[in-house]
Amino acid sequence: MPAKRQQQTIKRKTAGKKSSKKMNQQRSTLLISVHRTQAVFLLLLFAMIGVLMGIGVWKAGSAIFNYVDRTSRYDKMIVAAGRRNGVYPPLLKAVIWKESRFDASARGSKGEIGLMQVMPSSAVKDWENTFRRQVPSDGALMDPALNIEIGSWFLGRALERWKDYNDAEALALCEYNAGIQRAESWKPLLHDGKVMPNIDIESTRKYVRDILERRDEYEHEWNWEKLK
């Protein structure tokens, strides 16, 4: 091979190697850039997830705290009213739990108001006539102390009415939820008989069952006797 052609061949090979090396370097730089971008994206993603989880945990914790605070803030009122009106405090608290979930501003679809969802046309009116006192407005029934006082008095009167029955609490709850006429129709023939099989309204049967179960829970978990 002539010397000149040999030199040209060597130059082409050298140039090809340099070009290939340059392309490899560019490819490596591009890959590094892509990896860095992916790493930054993942870091940002994890950071966002962490923030969202933190917010979620905080909100959940806050909700739990608020609920626990709401379920216990009326304890002294419940115990005092229960003792005055002859209602076992765990039962009274269970009724409030069922009626309003401890929401003092709760309103029912039929005009029920407050913690114990008292009815202005029945419980409130009876209480006013008995004690010769006037509730100034429906809004006043959102006052926790007044609402619990009227509701516990109404429930206590029902308990007194059914005291000769073994299922006095269940009958009183039937009266509180569905009225005295229905409670009369559901009472057992014998004083030691059971009420639940006679209740033909599913919502009332569930109402009574839920409250009695919750009463049992409060009886064992709530240290109400020490409250004054």
Regions flagged by a language model, labelled:
Residues 1-37, 187:
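N-terminal Lys/Arg-rich, disordered targeting/topogenic segments
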Residues 25-80:
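N-terminal export signals and maturation junctions of secreted/periplasmic proteins
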Residues 56-228:
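Catalytic glycan-binding domains that act on GlcNAc-containing polysaccharides
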